[in-house]
Amino acid sequence: IIDLKLPQDVINIIDRNNWKDEYVGNQPAFCIYLGNDNGPFEDLAIVEKLIKDGTMILPVFFNDFSKEIPEELKKQNGIKYDDNQQSRIANIVLQAFELLRSTRKVFISYKRSESTSVAIQMYEALESHHFDVFLDTHSIEKGELFQEELWHRMTDCDVILLLNTPGFLESHWCKEELAEAGSKQIGIVQLVWPNHKINAISHLSFPLNLESTDFVNTIYDDKDKSKLKNNKVEEIVQFVESVRARNLASRQDNLITEFMSIAKQCGRDITVQPERYLTEVISGKKIIYVPTIGIPQSFNCQAADIRYEYDKNPQNTRIRLIYDDLRIRDKWLKHLDWLNNNLKKDIFTLKKQEFKKWLETTK
């Protein structure tokens, strides 16, 4: 919650002690059920009520799912707990409340002649943890415009995993990717190779220094044979998970700041709400601005608080998804424009390059 810069009371924590007083069935809810291998299973009456209400439940077990989780939750997809999973569990909760986007996108930036084998290893590891991973050799279909698609995928990622090898900045394309990350203000997790200095390369950078002992047989300088040890790979995956919220919040901050600055220049009176959307009232009609990171999707305006505001007075409420269109592929921008012209409800996207024009001319 702190990383997302949301008010502390945005989520109300309920347990068996305050359940009867605090739980309301028609409010959004998410349940974490902690497993117990000693038995008997606890709080089954609460579980049955939550299932009846259609509440999402995440079973968390410690050793054996079949022994620790009650029959009522055996159909649920659980997660095994350890200290490395804390960020993952927290993010699952935030995603369920639509406070953090559910697509977990990572872009791997590396120099092919120095770290191909590690790049592929991290691609496979992140995919196995259900990340949507971009790796240039694996993620672009034949016949696509390579560089255009690469920038497009970077724009839509949550975080960049940069394999900072000694020759990384000697590559023209690696430097281009780094510059692009800076212009888009995307946070970077740096894996810094042994005997290599950290470069101050981003406004939002999270370095992780690697030692030769982190590599299998201490081989770290062979592009085809170097492999990280399994425990280090797991540490990196969890590190990437832990910085997602901070990175997305930072990008959202920048988008809000830029939009508010232009709005002030145009004499508009716009308010930033604690839930991090913006509102404005003009001639008795409310406009809700939803800051969107990456490529706008329909679910960006389906969050519970946005739906609540819209449903109070749909006839006099407009929704605008504001987003940075830099490097989004033209075919996607045309699709979004087509949706703007064909949607029946007053819900449209508003691209960054048109902020000023729209704020100056729309009343």
List the predicted regions and their residue ranges.
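C-terminal interaction surface of TIR/SEFIR-family domains
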Residues: 1-5, 38-39, 51-128, 194-363
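An anion/phosphate-binding loop that grips the pyrophosphate of nucleotide cofactors and donors
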Residues: 28, 157
